[in-house]
Regions:
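Post-transcriptional modification and biogenesis factors for structured RNAs
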Residues: 1-247
């Protein structure tokens, strides 16, 4: 078994760079780290390019044997414990991470869904991860994100999705307003989050609706608000009015 020990190895350099959006965009790849999320990536048939393992994981049996059996079906790269800590994003690494191809090739919107969720410049990676996780939990399998929204493949977002990133199709919109106009042609109504209404998420019918979640500080862009058919208040996260989610 060959074990990489040098920081100058080209793969190691690439993995380190994948922490940056520029490299993720250029390579169309991102990282997932940890036993649970790597297991989910395998179970959900994510496009795994390589799995990176700490060279002592087999000796310590830190990774379950049944998972090691599945991991072995992929391209596996072993690195020293010291080097794994160097490439890891967490303080206490579990000795396994994977390089995965982004699931962003298909930009087609599924109009058979009753609900489409769209994000208008949501900035906080933790909020974005929570929204993806919530959307997944209620059976919505696609989400639209504006150009100004946080990167869906940011390591913090990926961790906070708890595997939802493998199941929810993320459609990046160059021009969200233009996309919404197209969706309206399919008889969907636009619902925006707003403080200027008494209606809540429990007061509307969710058949053929596009739910727009706005920026944490500024809300939904004015031009998109003007396109809205309905407005609703949404639950807030803590007292700083950060958006949590609106699907329940």
């Amino acid at each position: 078994m060959q074990v990489i020990s040098s920081k100058d190895n080209e793969l190691i350099k690439h993995i380190r760079k994948l922490k940056e959006k520029k490299e993720r965009d250029a390579s169309n790849e991102y990282l997932v780290e940890g036993i649970k999320i790597v297991k989910e990536a395998i179970q959900e048939n994510a496009k795994i390019k390589q799995i990176i393992l700490c060279d002592d994981c087999e000796k310590t049996e830190s990774i379950p044997k049944d998972l090691m059996y599945e991991i072995a079906k992929h391209i596996c790269i072993y690195v020293t414990s010291k080097l794994f800590k160097y490439i890891s994003e967490v303080q206490e690494p579990q000795g396994v991470l994977a390089v995965i191809e982004k699931n962003n090739g298909d930009k087609t919107i599924d109009y058979t869904q009753d609900i489409i969720v769209a994000l208008d410049d949501v900035q906080d990676p933790g909020n974005l991860g929570t929204i993806l996780r919530t959307v997944d939990s209620v059976g919505v399998n696609q989400i639209l994100v504006s150009k100004g929204t946080a990167d869906s493949y940011n390591p913090k977002v990926v961790r906070s999705t708890m595997g939802a990133i493998f199941r929810v199709k993320i459609i990046e919109c160059e021009d969200l307003k233009k996309t919404l106009k197209e969706i309206k042609k399919h008889k969907f109504k636009i619902v925006v989050s707003s403080l200027q209404t008494e209606n809540t998420i429990y007061d509307i019918n969710y058949y053929k609706k596009v739910i727009i979640i706005g920026n944490e500080a500024n809300g939904v862009e004015q031009q998109i608000q003007e396109m809205a058919d309905e407005k609703i208040k949404i639950p807030m996260l803590r007292k700083n009015r950060k958006l949590k989610c609106i699907c329940s």
